[in-house]
């Protein structure tokens, strides 16, 4: 097995209704390989898979439900086994909340508590709390989510488990051609087909917006300058608000007919404009699809 001190594993457990789903989504946003409801008896096998992954699973978050006493025997054994391995140090994140808060959440979602499927949720909560006493005592971090909104819980997890780089709000700016379809992962789409098209100038037809002659042509028009002024003003206004709402990244797509000239030029411009303030990735989805045709 490989020795790798960079492997991180977080076991997420705690009271049902305390926010495990939000927690797993938060770890997923941080680039963790996430598995929900992993039976504790499978944990040793999963650890072996991590060891053999050659770095492909160097950050893992596992959501584990402990709804039967027999599960604890498997979990304690697996955790004791982990303590003997130098290449991985597990962290246990225990999510808790007040009984009254958990009851309210179950009423709002109209779901039954897993330990009281036909009874009152409070009975199930009390039973689960008793089962999880030792688990809570062994946890590295206990988070009380009673007064936390989902966005606030996510912010806490990001603060606790991410590096400064991982906390950075990422902006992806891409060009595309409408004839090939709008990118399905785009958050914001801008249509620049109203701008003069270099495609109809014969010697520019095989070029792209990455070529200086094309970009200079597109950027020389007054309407281009006015549009870029309004676009950068709008994006600069919106980005801090998206970040405040808890988004980890935003995809901005700029499209022209074929994704060769106008959209490429403006995508490059916007990317350079945003880079001093944000972590920006610029890409051109369709730039090779009909180049030279």
Swiss-Prot record:
GTP binds at residues 65-68. SUPFAM superfamilies: P-loop containing nucleoside triphosphate hydrolases (SSF52540). ATP binds at residues 14-21. The keyword Magnesium does not apply. It holds the Pfam family PapZ_C. Keywords: ATP-binding, GTP-binding, Nucleotide-binding. The keyword Nucleotide-binding applies. One of its GO terms (molecular function) is GTP binding. It comes from the Bacteria. HAMAP family: RapZ_like. Belongs to the RapZ-like family. Displays ATPase and GTPase activities. This is Nucleotide-binding protein BcerKBAB4_4948.
């Amino acid at each position: 097995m490989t020795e790798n001190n960079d492997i991180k594993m977080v076991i997420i457990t705690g009271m049902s209704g305390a926010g495990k789903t939000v927690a797993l989504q938060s770890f997923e946003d941080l680039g963790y390989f996430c598995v929900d409801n992993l039976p504790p008896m499978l944990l040793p096998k999963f650890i072996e898979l991590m060891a053999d992954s050659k770095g492909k699973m160097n950050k893992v978050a596992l959501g584990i439900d402990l709804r039967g006493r027999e599960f604890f025997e498997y979990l304690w054994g697996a955790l004791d086994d982990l303590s003997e391995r130098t290449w991985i140090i597990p962290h246990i994140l225990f999510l808790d909340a007040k009984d009254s808060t958990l009851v309210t959440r179950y009423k709002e979602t109209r779901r039954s508590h897993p330990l009281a499927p036909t009874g009152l949720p409070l009975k199930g909560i009390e039973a689960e709390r008793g089962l999880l006493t030792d688990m809570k005592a062994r946890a590295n971090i206990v988070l009380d989510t009673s007064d936390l909104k989902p966005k606030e819980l996510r912010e806490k997890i990001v603060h606790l488990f991410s590096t400064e780089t991982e906390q950075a709000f990422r902006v992806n700016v891409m060009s595309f051609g409408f004839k090939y379809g709008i990118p399905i992962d785009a958050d914001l789409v801008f249509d620049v087909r109203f701008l003069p098209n270099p495609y109809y100038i014969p010697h520019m037809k095989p070029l792209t917006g990455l070529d200086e002659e094309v970009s200079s042509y597109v950027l020389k028009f007054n309407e281009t300058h006015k549009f870029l002024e309004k676009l950068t003003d709008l994006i600069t206004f919106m980005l801090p608000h998206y970040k405040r709402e808890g988004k980890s990244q935003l995809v901005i797509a700029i499209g022209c007919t074929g994704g060769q000239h106008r959209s490429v030029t403006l995508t490059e411009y916007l990317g350079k404009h945003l880079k001093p303030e944000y972590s920006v990735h610029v890409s051109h989805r369709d730039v090779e699809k009909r180049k030279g045709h």
